[in-house]
């Protein structure tokens, strides 16, 4: 390009002796010929002179070269840029001149009408980044006595038609969908695909497979599993979404709450020494029971994490927050204060907030990252026993969906993944399956939410040090003891319960009860299934040398195996009762199921290792425990003249088992002694009341009063009741502790109970006579004082679903020590509340305590 491409005609120096204001004559030279190098421009005056009449610009034609083109040269010094060819200097007027200006007007008027081209600074001024007056030669070049060469504008890029790329992608996707439609139409025309055959249809050679092709699709942030038909077009669809999608929101705040702009991760991050301690606690107490973290890989980040969170990637930061949270969960309040100097509840709140906000900021719902799912699984485990169990189970469904999105339900070998990733995916998937099964039971469901349609194999018996990240061949499984033993045992037991297809919950409720009939089970089939499981577990333990002497993890796994087999073997179906036999009623069976649930928490105590006590605490449900204690106030030891001695003996055994579990619960959960918590205070009063009745019953039978257990004495001292063994409760309670009967709670006319299922009249509130100042409910029931009544209709849900909240509520309604302390709310059942500890939003009806602040409003309690 020429050095004067953007210089006005009046300011251009003369070239080859020609007058600068006169255009060159057309030479008719070949346009493809090389142009001669331009001579050095002669100095001209910096003062621009008005152009003369002869300096009027001329119109360039194909036979006449434009300005800047040397005679005899076909190539312009402007390089024939499209923008330059379309410059007003080279274009003829597109319309006749107007009447107010003559056609041959003054050139200065034509210059004003034309848009002046942009004049760039010279090359020297651009390189030095100094101001250029854009008059060539410029002042700077003249002072430096160097040639002043104007700069060349950047060439314009060739623009593609608008949305051409999007149209091409849409055309490709449309063509593929058309091809699929034609194949489907052909299949329908041949009679296949219209009806579902009774036998599997023969495979066809069509490229369209109804089962899809499982694959991992690479995308930003990780990989995504897809096995549907649209997976074949995912790449094209993904590029199209990238062109048109402008919404970055993934909805994470809908689950974990909105982001807090003022939150600083450093404010919740522990000190460097505490980071090492928390990680060590996690690997000692949590990791042996939840082998979802590869320890050698994580240890490479510990040193970096000790210096602060900002050098870590968001997924690693979320993982460390969850590890810190689980480490605090595994400690009790005294251990937390002694080892770390933390207040346990405050540490739980800080680390939980750090984990939640990290999840929200990284948009964890839209990420396809295994580390993020590991962190989220640990976070959900930490919520067990600290938040609403129903909300936790709902959140666990989110984790399972994320796992399916990552393809964890398909074995990694089938997907061609490396051995280490394959093994860690197996561990994480089976941990989610076990967690879902446990949480579903606590939430009141008989079966887990996850569907048994996965192909993920059970994890191998391997130590973390056996798995190297760079391994290419499959790992060789160990035959000796490893830390995986407890996880493998729980995976095996859960898989048995999910695949057996039997209602073992119903079997266990009815087992050992006189006249109990195991619902929907066959004696021979049940016996064969349990024997087969016992053989499999025996072979399993023999192969991996399961023995308590191999360490605390093996001791816990050994107790778990014995407990599991014992319960299943004892849960054999019983013959139906005869006409003169009296079996257990629904309340008795619900009471037994609640005791069995508490016996599961006894499991860790059998190991006598405090490091694993947390595993029972996280699944402890205080409302289920309250239900057992409340029932102990109703159960009375049968007399020697009881007609149905077999039933009486079974009930006595249940009472003894319940009191043994109460002792274990107070040993496992020292927080229950904190009577500043209103719920724990009411439980403590109920325990004292139940023990008082048991003590009196044993006194009548044996003539001696049994000594009070240590936890009863401690509760009596805390509550100021020092006469527990003398039969006095300090005058604090005068009610009989009986539950209301159907007669007491009988609805009046028009309530709809007789003709329907409306139980609104059975839900006491401020208007039902249970609030402060309301009339008390009579404690003498229609069946007589001291006689246990049949449960009202609304208690049917306790037996069908064993929802601890329902069982608790059913035994609190009425003046039995809880009815005068709680009021059923006059508000929708799906009231949303925020837990101060976890910050989660969950649903559930709260209870209202009496007005303790004197403001006329009842105090609100958590459900």
UniProtKB/Swiss-Prot annotation:
Bias (Polar residues): 67-84, 97-113
Gene3D superfamilies: Zn(2)-C6 fungal-type DNA-binding domain
Keywords, alphabetical: Coiled coil, DNA-binding, Metal-binding, Nucleus, Transcription, Transcription regulation, Zinc
Upregulation: Expression is induced by ketoconazole treatment.
InterPro entries according to UniProt: Sec_Metabolite_Reg, Transcription_factor_dom_fun, Zn2-C6_fun-type_DNA-bd_sf, Zn2Cys6_DnaBD
Region (Disordered): 1-115, 189-214, 744-775
Keyword match Coiled coil: yes
Gene Ontology CC annotations of this record: nucleus
Coiled-coil ranges from the UniProt annotation: 163-190
Family annotation (PANTHER family): UNCHARACTERIZED TRANSCRIPTIONAL REGULATORY PROTEIN, ZN(II)2CYS6 TRANSCRIPTION FACTOR (EUROFUNG)
The name this protein goes by in its record: Transcription factor ads-1
Organism lineage string: Eukaryota, Fungi, Dikarya, Ascomycota, Pezizomycotina
